[in-house]
Every structure is written in C-alpha cells, then in structure tokens.
Amino acid sequence: MAKAPMRVAVTGAAGQIGYSLLFRIANGDLLGKDQPVILQLLEIPDEKAQKALAGVMMELEDCAFPLLAGMTAHSDPMTAFKDIDVALLVGARPRGPGMERKDLLSANAQIFTAQGKALNVVAKKTVKVLVVGNPANTNAYIAMKSAPDIPAKNFTAMLRLDHNRALSQLANKLNKPVADIEKLVVWGNHSPTMYPDYRFATIDGKSVKDSINDAAWNKDVFIPTVGKRGAAIIEARGLSSAASAANAAIDHIHDWVLGTNGKWVTMGIPSKGEYDIPAEVIYGFPVVCENGEYKMIEGLEIDEFSRERMTHTLNELLEEQAGVKHLLS
C-alpha cells in the first residue's frame, strides 16, 4: 500500500538554495523513493519573490515527479507550516554591505522568532526542523526558544556541509574514496570557527590521523581550508554555495529520518551539557541516527588542542546568543 504523503515546508523557496533543493525533495532524495511528499513553500510577501516562486512551481509541475503529491505557495508561516512533518528553514536575511554582525543577528532574530512561534502553533509536535539560513546555530536556537511546545531536540542546525567539506578534503589528501572514511566529527558553530576533527576517523578501518601523521597540515591547511571553503566558493563563483548546501540539507534530514546504519554524522543539536558545552547551546556534535532519532556519541577523549578549538567556537556561539537574548521574550 502506498504511504501517506509527508508534508515538507521550505522557506526561502525561490532562493538559490531552494532552487537546488526542491527538485531533489520531489524526486525522493530527502525521505525515500517510496515516500510521497507535499511541498509547502514559503517566500517573503514581496510581489517579485512570489512571482519567482510561482515560476519554480511551474518547473516542479513540468518534471511530473511521481512522488510529488501536491504543493502550495505561501507568504505567511502560519499557513506554510500547517501540519508539517519536516521544516527546512533556508530563508534568512543575508548580510548586506556595511551591515554589522549584530544588525544581521537582530534581523534574523525577528524572522526566526516569528517562524518558531508559527511552528509552535500549527506544525505537528513531532516536526523535524533543520535551520540552514545563517547564522544557522543561533537562528535554530531562536526558533527553539520561540516554540516551547515542541521538544527542543527537534530543532537542529546544519553542520553537514562542513562535515561533507571535511570528508572530501581528507579523501583528497589520502587519495581514497570519501565513502571509505568513517567517524569524522565537526564540533561547534557553522562558521569559520568550527572544528573539523579526524582524531577518531578511520579509512578502510585504519586510523586517518596515523595515515596523515602531520599536525602542521591539520592546523595550518586542513582546518582553515574547511573553515574558509564557503568564502573560497564565493570568490570563485561570484555566488555563495547553493547546490552543496542543498545537498547537505538533504543528507541531514535523510539520515535523521531514515537512519545512518551506525555511521557517525555531524548535526547541530541542543546540548544537554555533554563535552562541557552549556545546556541549550545548539552545537555541532557527532551523532548516529536510527528510528527517526539522533543519538550523540559520548565519551570521546578531548585533548588540549581540541578543547581550545571547541571553546573558541563555543565562545562565538555564546556571544551570538547574548546578542539576541533581549529579543527573545
């Protein structure tokens, strides 16, 4: 018997990442090749944005995806989020010229407060929320704090792009396929401060750290390359990474819903105090997923270099949180 359709909301649906994301969701890449979906697409209530969204929906129709059971366009989160199973919060205020980081934080705080409140009222209480729009960890924190009736654990931020970037850098360094690498971790904020950590990683069952055996490469090449990869893409392409971000969002939700078969992945999730990260901070941690739930990998040894990096990215998150505290009622 055919499965009942799942409802997926995507915000910023006519944007660059949205355009790379929607066709893959409708093709079954997000929730499985046997799972029909209904897309509930949110854009700002601006005539140009709504018109662009109508054009994207025309293209989605023209693909005649067997799994696309329906789609609707919205300018209000209260209708866009009605009865949804999954929310991909992609739309965020980009940083404009001359804009201070604190201005960016407060502009996004307004967006994510409104969206969190709407999720709280109209979404399913089991909704799985992924924030892609930057600053992703703090935006996820704002949405979580604005939705007290939805479990905090349902709010996540996207660290999977950093995770995938780190995987490919290691695969290139070792001249091996990415699929052979397991147990990579990316700690912290989705920003250049995040800490990709391959101390536990294996390739074909052998230690990646022992295979590379180069602390200087780790510190001076690997970590900065992963941290600055987004900027390098803007420099090369003139536009920010959209297809790779959409791909990471698909990976994140796909694994959360359908499981990782014991493989470690990185998700930005609310801390419960693990690894001395204060409770409620949405921080990149290693997890495995099964039966629609993620479970943190606990008890990993944190050496001095790692603790320093983990604290550095934590401090940035705490600073961002402090910058929006007054905006959260």
UniProtKB/Swiss-Prot annotation:
Gene3D superfamilies from the UniProt entry: Lactate dehydrogenase/glycoside hydrolase, family 4, C-terminal (3.90.110.10), NAD(P)-binding Rossmann-like Domain (3.40.50.720)
Active site (catalytic residues): 190 (proton acceptor)
Record-linked InterPro entries: L-lactate/malate_DH (IPR001557), Lactate/malate_DH_C (IPR022383), Lactate/malate_DH_N (IPR001236), Lactate_DH/Glyco_Ohase_4_C (IPR015955), Malate_DH_type2 (IPR010945), NAD(P)-bd_dom_sf (IPR036291)
A molecular function GO annotation: L-malate dehydrogenase (NAD+) activity
Annotated residues for binding of substrate: 95, 101, 134, 165
Record's keyword terms, sorted: NAD, Oxidoreductase, Tricarboxylic acid cycle
This protein's record includes keyword NAD: yes
Highest taxon of source: Bacteria
Record EC number: 1.1.1.37
GO biological process: malate metabolic process; tricarboxylic acid cycle
Binding-site residues, NAD(+): 12-18, 108, 115, 132-134
Catalysed reaction, written as an equation: (S)-malate + NAD(+) = oxaloacetate + NADH + H(+)
Family, similarity comment: Belongs to the LDH/MDH superfamily. MDH type 2 family.
NCBIfam families found in the cross-reference section: MalateDH-SF1, PRK05442.1
General function of this protein: Catalyzes the reversible oxidation of malate to oxaloacetate.
Protein name: Malate dehydrogenase
Annotated organism of origin: Polynucleobacter necessarius subsp. necessarius (strain STIR1)
